[in-house]
Regions:
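N-terminal Sec-pathway targeting helices
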Residues: 3-22
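Intrinsically disordered, low-complexity segments enriched in small/polar residues
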Residues: 4-5, 23, 59, 276
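Transmembrane alpha-helices
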Residues: 18-28, 114-115
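Hydrophobic single-pass membrane-insertion segments
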Residues: 28-39
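Aromatic-Pro/Gly-enriched surface loop or interdomain linker
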Residues: 43-184, 258-260, 267-302
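Helical hinge/lid and interdomain linker segments adjacent to catalytic or ligand-binding clefts
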Residues: 151-229
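A glycine-rich, often tryptophan-bearing local segment used as a flexible ligand/cofactor-contacting loop or short
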Residues: 198-281
């Protein structure tokens, strides 16, 4: 008759120890602190009134909401809604005393270490009687010449949240106008941070793309060329964004244009990738400077 073969005998002690290790591992994984962020795709535009704050974006005509637990915000944030727009009308952002160590970690080290360029032309282009009124056929060619704003009025399209966060972290700031009037100004800084500077002049484009260390913190930057008239204090669309021909996309024919990433506002796989004169982000981090430590760390460390 065939010889009976006994299966391997597992020590009860080993088995019990293994179960204990599995339980401990599960507890440790569950206890790791996480930023409580979720993406809600429903078409509702209200802010949470309790423990969460809601940031709303528009993605190809579809409203997307990013929901963040208030305790995970990196700054005390007060949002004023705009009844006529899905995006906030304004924000007040202040540091949290308990995050002082983190702020020091991600702050600019000195006045010439890093500078960001505020997109003042983009702010105006998206404004009333601006370029988008022309694109939407609500206005004729006269809307392609726009007044240069006298000051910052940060909006969603002009990188509202990060343009308020970076000054709190000691980053120097200049505007499109500063670079257009004096392109060499960028040479003063080790690192240049470009936000959603969609509309820039040729002199500004050349100054940015020739700088050796640029962080393109938003996609769709350097997308269309404008021309300034400082006598009239205006700027005019020259080329790009389907103008003067619908076949024209990037007004500078820039081979590193990354506008395809601007439609990813969830940023679930956000990273910076390398190009010859710096790094670019692979999604549209609209409000991430308010709650995502890794975003601010990447800007600092890149």
């Amino acid at each position: 008759m065939p010889r009976k073969v006994n299966g391997p005998v597992v020590s009860r002690t080993v088995l019990v120890a293994s179960v204990i290790m599995i339980v401990i591992g599960a507890v440790l994984i569950a206890s790791v602190p996480r930023t409580r962020v979720s993406l809600d795709d429903t078409n509702v535009n209200t802010h949470s009134a309790s423990d969460y704050v809601q940031f709303t974006t528009m993605n190809e005509g579809k409203i997307e909401k990013i929901i963040v637990h208030k305790s995970d915000l990196l700054f005390d944030t007060e949002i004023t809604d705009d009844k006529n727009n899905i995006h906030p009308k304004s924000m007040i952002i202040e540091k949290k005393p308990e995050l002082a160590d983190f702020y020091r970690q991600v702050a600019s080290t000195n006045a010439t270490d890093a500078v960001f360029v505020y997109p003042i032309f983009t702010q105006a282009a998206y404004g009333k009687d601006g370029f988008y009124n022309y694109y939407n056929k609500d206005c004729d060619i006269k809307c392609l010449t726009v007044a240069i704003p006298p000051g910052f009025v940060p909006t969603y399209s002009s990188s509202m949240s990060i343009s308020k966060v970076l000054p709190l972290l000691n980053y120097s700031e200049i505007t499109d106008v500063d670079v257009d009037k004096n392109p060499d100004i960028l040479k003063k800084y080790h690192k240049v941070i470009i936000l959603h500077n969609e509309y820039v002049t040729k002199k500004e484009f050349d100054a940015i793309t020739s700088h050796p260390h640029v962080i393109y913190a938003f996609p769709n930057a350097l997308y269309a060329e404008v021309r300034t008239n400082y006598t009239d204090n205006t700027f005019t669309l020259v080329r790009g964004h389907g103008y003067p021909s619908s076949s024209i996309e990037n007004g500078f024919d820039w081979k590193f244009d990354n506008s395809r990433y601007e439609y990813d506002t969830a940023c679930k796989n956000m990273t910076f990738y390398t190009i010859p004169n710096g790094k670019m982000v692979n999604c549209y981090p609209a409000y991430r400077s308010l709650f995502d430590k890794s975003f601010l760390e990447m800007i600092k460390e890149s």
